[in-house]
């Protein structure tokens, strides 16, 4: 007679699936309040770690249904697959049912193509061989364009300066420093002629110096020199102009008066014909 064998597994080898919410009614009973607290903790954990922009719509419906659902008191466990599903814990992991080509496609999507023709807006470029070659090619072109712009901008300025100078002004005297030293600190801004090319002889006029210079009479010299508006020397120097023929309207009376003045200058003091005699006498030359 064959007897039926009964095999009992020891308690240490039992693999009863339990979850965080599974309780033993005799040792650790779980009430509704504690159950709701565990649900809220689980929901906060999902919101902080797992949920993202891509799977918000998929998991929101599950979370709302889990929160609104009130399980009966007799239920002792929840399906462990929902808690230990690696796809829910980390949504970036590839699923098991995908083909072997999934990792390659996943990597290709993350790859970024670099545009070799990209030029940044800033003028500072990285020091690479390609950038150095481009800069060396651009420099001669930029220098040629810059020099042409300089020439074009300088020409109108010269023309405007020539047009601004009036035609009535001209240089009638040579520059002393230029004629003696060969250089002038004023350069082109000098008011005197640098060489015979810039010198223009003034037309002769009939205006002569008739009043004697006070500095010439008292000191024997005048700091103004030839630019002085008064006469230096005796009245006999007017005869030079008369002989040259530039001053022909000299009357006999004026000649006689000039001779009398020249003869009587040594004996008698000449009268000052100015009105403010006292003011002139106080001046010290």
UniProtKB/Swiss-Prot annotation:
Predominant localisation class: nucleus
Residue ranges covered by zinc fingers (C3H1-type): 169-197, 207-235
Region (Disordered): 132-164, 252-271
SUPFAM superfamilies linked to this entry: CCCH zinc finger
Compartments where found: Nucleus; Cytoplasm, P-body
Keyword Nucleus: yes
Keyword terms of this UniProt record: Cytoplasm, Metal-binding, Nucleus, Repeat, RNA-binding, Zinc, Zinc-finger
Residue spans of biased composition, Polar residues class: 153-164
Pfam families named among the record's database cross-references: zf-CCCH (PF00642)
GO CC term (a single one): mitochondrion
Region (Required for mRNA decay activity): 37-55
Keyword Transferase: no
GO annotation terms (biological process): electron transport coupled proton transport; intracellular iron ion homeostasis; negative regulation of cytoplasmic translation; nuclear-transcribed mRNA catabolic process; response to iron ion starvation
Molecular function per GO: mRNA binding; translation repressor activity; zinc ion binding
Upregulation: By transcription factors AFT1 and AFT2 in response to iron deficiency.
Known partners and oligomeric status: Interacts with DHH1.
Role noted for this protein: Binds to specific AU-rich elements (ARE) in the 3'-untranslated region of target mRNAs and promotes their degradation. In response to iron deficiency, promotes the decay of many mRNAs encoding proteins involved in iron-dependent pathways. Recruits the DHH1 helicase to the SDH4 mRNA and promotes SDH4 mRNA decay. Also destabilizes target mRNA by modulating 3'-end processing, creating extended transcripts that are prone for degradation.
Name used for this protein in its record: mRNA decay factor CTH2
Organism: Saccharomyces cerevisiae (strain ATCC 204508 / S288c)
Biological classification of the source: Eukaryota, Fungi, Dikarya, Ascomycota, Saccharomycotina
